[in-house]
Amino acid sequence: MDSEALGPADLAGLAEVTEAEIGRMVDLGVLVPSDGPAPFRTTDMQKVRLATACERAGLPMDAIAALIRSGRLSFAFLGAAPYHRFAVPSSVTYRQVSRDTGVPLETLRETLESMGFAWTSPDEAMREDELEVVPLIRLAAATEIVDQVWITRVGRAYAEGMRLAAQVENEAYRARFEEPVLASGLGQRQAMERASEIAGEFVPLVDRALMAVYRRQQELIWTEHQVENIEAALEEAGAIVRPERVPAMCFLDLAGYTRLTEERGDQAAAELAATLAVLVEHLARGQRGTPVKWLGDGVMLHYREPAGAVESALGMVRRVPEAGLPQAHVGVAAGPVVVQGGDYFGRTVNLGAWIAA
């Protein structure tokens, strides 16, 4: 998003508020206009959006403005480069895009909502980042390779994966930067301004790293699928004979985790969970296993073969206490499972959970 000069009406339109609201924020000192008929910049939109979000959450705008005037708080950091990437409304509505692309409005709405976007009316302007998704939706609808159920399922997986990544990034920022900076005596204003400067270096590298990680995961999943297809073809041709294989589910539960949380606090519990995640990921990968769902004090894992699940489970029972974690209870069950949306269901799953309990 390029920073352009805007008049009050233009800024109100971008931020989706009234011009009177812009005037009120100027009077309060939340917005600081320059001289001339176009006293605002496109980046002021983020200040309006943040102030509006605070007010909708029940935070008094007058009190926020008082902190800004006293120098204890500032929205100036929102003008930094990392915030220029956030999308603004486009010049076309959902209805217009639907008409121009041939994608039904309901398909457009369901797919965008599955990816974390939201709309209230087909006649409101689409965000520019939503427009980036439209070609994919159009191609999926035109080729019919995936139906609406599957495209929304894939969209939900994209959104959940990215939401988790953004959430953990934010947790890392708070723990490793914001809290230490505030503890050093600097105020919230200085902390946010310094963070914006540093983020300018990190953000482009994070974008590249995310795509690299995604492509690596595609390589792993696609290769595994191709190997299974080749194996099936060889079996069908009689070139190899394999015994029938069934997957296995493994559940790991830390004994006394709740009591430990109460005694040591939430931060200690979070650190234990992080240690467990690294250990489990390492042991599972060596036995063709994959962590499927983290359950706070435990984890559910899927294995391609029961032997790998048993070997991995024994390693977890042995290694978990060595890592300074509470004793682990594990349960392993082999049998057919139902896979949907990246999760696993069925009697095998329930039995594994029951054994670990």
Spans of features found by a protein language model:
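Residue-level signature of catalytic and energy-coupling elements of molecular machines
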Residues: 111, 280, 296, 332, ...
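Short, solvent-exposed loop/turn segments at secondary-structure boundaries
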Residues: 37, 123, 263-264, 341-345
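Short, conserved loop/turn and helix-capping segments at secondary-structure boundaries
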Residues: 42-45, 128, 266-270, 274, ...
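Hydrophobic alpha-helical membrane-association signature
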Residues: 154, 202, 272-276, 312, ...
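Catalytic NTP-binding/metal-coordinating core of nucleotidyl cyclase/transferase enzymes
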Residues: 232-315, 319
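Short secondary-structure junction motifs
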Residues: 121, 289, 325-329
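Arg/Lys-rich, alpha-helical DNA-contact motif
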Residues: 1-235
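Catalytic beta-strand-to-alpha-helix segment of the class III nucleotidyl cyclase homology domain
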Residues: 302-357
